[in-house]
Amino acid sequence: MSLPSPWRADFPAFSAFAAEGLTYLDSAATAQKPQAVLDALNGYYLGGAANVHRAQHVPGERATRAFEAARSRVAHWLHAGNPAEVLFTRGTTEAINLVAYGLERHFRPGDELLVSALEHHANLLPWQQLALRRGLVLRVLPLDERGVIDLEQARHIIGERTRLLAISQLSNVLGTWQPVVELIQLARERGAWTLVDGAQGSVHGRHDLPGLGCDFYAFSGHKLYGPDGIGVLWGRPQALEQLAHWQFGGEMVRHTGFHEASFHAAPLGFEAGTPAVSAAIGLGATIDWLATLDEAEVAAHEGALHARLLAGLLARDGVSLLGEPQAALASFCVDGVHVADLAHLLGEQGIAVRAGHHCAMPLLQRLEVPGALRVSLGLYNDADDLERFFLALDRSLELLR
């Protein structure tokens, strides 16, 4: 079965890749962009760029309408109740830092912050550093042998001192879906805030906020086939009201003198300075493009490709998967082979994958591996991409063994 992607033609980058002999299998790091997004970016600049929320002229009003329309599209896509619940950020990393700084005043020494053992540095370091600043306790939820947060152990760890739970929806290293709904329920029973890192999960169909029940949800545009430099923090209205302002400057201020100021509520109060106007408009176009797709068809295509990827890896001697991948990607090691050497040889054959710790050093330390090679899929990949990857992998292993 050839498993062609019916959406590949929407992505101009693949024409360029074909001309260069490249096979792109690194979508968990960043995704390629469909023509609809490129058209939106180009159209904004060709029509005249302007700042938003601060001009009475036609270009400014036009830019503001497009910017806020993008916010509304994101809110609708997330099934959020109100566009005002959507804050634009530079990405998932900034969104999580915003929450960490915004909630800091509410914590007292000895309060507990909970993350899991698989977190990306973006959902670890903000809480680690907050704990160090405020004398808090950072606790780590362990994983089971599959690479899934152990719910039974979590029930014993989430307790009276738990004030915040921050977890990833889909591991960027293990490719495992996490039991976020159950964990959120446990945390809410203790009155703790909950944040979900949706950088990977949002890309693969799980972006229904009412179904999650979290207080905050963060994701990045560039992994979702959208522009770089734009991300989203969604917040429950009651949770957003608890955030202190953390960046200060133009347009987030309601009134200021030399010695005091008052600030806007969300979202504008958390979007200081000139926002990424074009990127936000491009993200709106991304959401529009995604809305034209049949999610079940996309899921079936990605699932079939992922199954073929796993089968091919497991069929090769010496290959060990990290965890039990369920979606989108697979990370692996090869006995007696350094992943950097393997990635180099694959790159020389035009195969774009990633090697290293994948911004999850503590996870790889717990797994007792110095690094791993990751293959990650997008909806534009097809079986031919995997065939080229496996051919290059076999050639590389012949040289390295």
Curated annotation (Swiss-Prot):
Keyword annotations: Pyridoxal phosphate, Transferase
Reaction catalyzed: (sulfur carrier)-H + L-cysteine = (sulfur carrier)-SH + L-alanine
One of the GO BP terms on file: cysteine metabolic process
Residues recorded with modification N6-(pyridoxal phosphate)lysine: 223
Top-tier EC class: transferase
Cofactor(s) the protein requires to work: pyridoxal 5'-phosphate
InterPro entries in the cross-refs: Aminotrans_V_dom (IPR000192), Aminotrans_V_PyrdxlP_BS (IPR020578), Cys_dSase_SufS (IPR010970), PyrdxlP-dep_Trfase (IPR015424), PyrdxlP-dep_Trfase_major (IPR015421), PyrdxlP-dep_Trfase_small (IPR015422)
SUPFAM superfamilies referenced in this protein's UniProt entry, alphabetically: PLP-dependent transferases
EC code: 2.8.1.7
GO terms assigned for molecular function: cysteine desulfurase activity; pyridoxal phosphate binding
A Pfam family: Aminotran_5
Function according to Swiss-Prot or TrEMBL: Catalyzes the removal of elemental sulfur and selenium atoms from L-cysteine, L-cystine, L-selenocysteine, and L-selenocystine to produce L-alanine.
Family: Belongs to the class-V pyridoxal-phosphate-dependent aminotransferase family. Csd subfamily.
Annotated protein name in UniProt: Probable cysteine desulfurase
Taxonomic lineage: Bacteria, Pseudomonadati, Pseudomonadota, Gammaproteobacteria, Pseudomonadales
Gene that this sequence comes from: csd
